[in-house]
């Protein structure tokens, strides 16, 4: 089996993300920590920021804040309000941390019609659901849409969304961008146990190769790698090879479906076909892999020929008996 060494990241960019549901007094943008459930929501934000600022391996690079409001009231008013509220959140974070104003990127969604649509589509208990969706999807201006919603079914549909959907649309999404320093193999052996997301794929590969090939530790690292980088072709190929080594061919096929078409991935698919007895399919793939430079392909083609010879001998024996 042929493993691939991943390319090194020139700089390891990572992010912590979250959503806070802060409550504001009607028409106001001041953050009141003791108002309703704000204390626990602010704790979530502070905890996420602390997880970054307290880690000596991390350099914070910036915070993106995006405020969302629900489609209730005039669009112009909601635009002002969501803008002021996201600025208030920035100022609150700055009051707790030594971040310059330039550290922040602010965005706002005055009325979250996309979120409203997604929730309406999923809510089959909503009164006049089809009519509500028709209004949401129309080309009307936001304030005109709201007026039509308020008039629908004598206001029962709007009362429903006001209570059951709009509260969850009013939120602040935050993302803290940071970079992570490089680790030695010895450091990587420890970091992978507690904060694997801080390791690059190439660092994980180096950690894996510091263990005996096929050992539990070796296999564990590749399995962690594919969990952390689930869509990466290299991580999936290496995990597939581990699964083949364990005899877990179904898992190997699942990983190989996301492993791309590198010579090594083609080789691994050929190995599975060889094991499963599809000698013609295996030969096609193994020859492709050999031509593309996979050294192990030649040995597997010899193994394939031995199987063909054994099958021919077996068939010949049966014919004479």
Please identify what each model-predicted range represents.
Residues 212-215, 246, 276, 308:
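Structural motif corresponding to the intra-repeat A-B loop/turn of tetratricopeptide repeats
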Residues 209-212, 243, 273, 305:
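Residue at a conserved register position within TPR or TPR-like alpha-solenoid repeats
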């Amino acid at each position: 089996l042929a493993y691939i060494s991943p390319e090194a990241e020139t700089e390891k960019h990572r992010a912590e993300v979250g959503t806070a549901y802060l409550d504001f007094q009607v028409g106001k943008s001041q953050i009141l920590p003791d108002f309703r459930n704000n204390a626990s929501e602010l704790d979530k934000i502070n905890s996420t920021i602390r997880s970054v600022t307290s880690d000596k391996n991390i350099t914070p690079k910036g915070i993106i804040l995006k405020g969302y409001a629900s489609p209730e009231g005039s669009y112009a008013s909601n635009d002002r309000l969501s803008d002021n509220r996201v600025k208030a959140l920035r100022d609150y974070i700055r009051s707790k941390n030594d971040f310059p104003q330039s550290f922040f990127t602010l965005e706002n969604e005055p009325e979250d019609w996309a979120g409203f649509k997604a929730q309406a589509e999923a809510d089959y208990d909503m009164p006049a659901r089809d009519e509500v969706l028709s209004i949401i999807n129309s080309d009307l201006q936001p304030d005109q849409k709201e007026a039509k919603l308020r008039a629908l079914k004598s206001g029962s549909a709007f009362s429903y969304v006001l209570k059951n959907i709009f509260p969850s649309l009013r939120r602040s999404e935050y993302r803290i961008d940071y970079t992570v320093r490089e680790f030695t193999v010895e450091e990587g052996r420890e970091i992978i146990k507690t904060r694997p997301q801080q390791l690059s794929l190439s660092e994980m590969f180096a950690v894996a190769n510091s263990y005996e090939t096929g050992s539990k530790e070796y296999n564990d690292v590749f399995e962690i790698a594919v969990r952390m980088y689930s869509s990466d072709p290299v991580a999936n190929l290496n995990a597939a090879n581990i699964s083949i080594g364990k005899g877990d061919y179904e898992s190997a096929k699942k990983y190989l479906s996301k492993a791309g078409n590198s010579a090594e991935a083609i080789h691994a698919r050929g190995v599975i076909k060889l094991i499963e007895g599809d000698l013609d399919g295996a030969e096609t793939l193994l020859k492709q892999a050999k031509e593309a430079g996979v050294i192990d392909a030649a040995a597997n083609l010899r193994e394939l020929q031995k199987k063909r010879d054994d099958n021919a001998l077996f068939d010949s024996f049966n014919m004479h008996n």
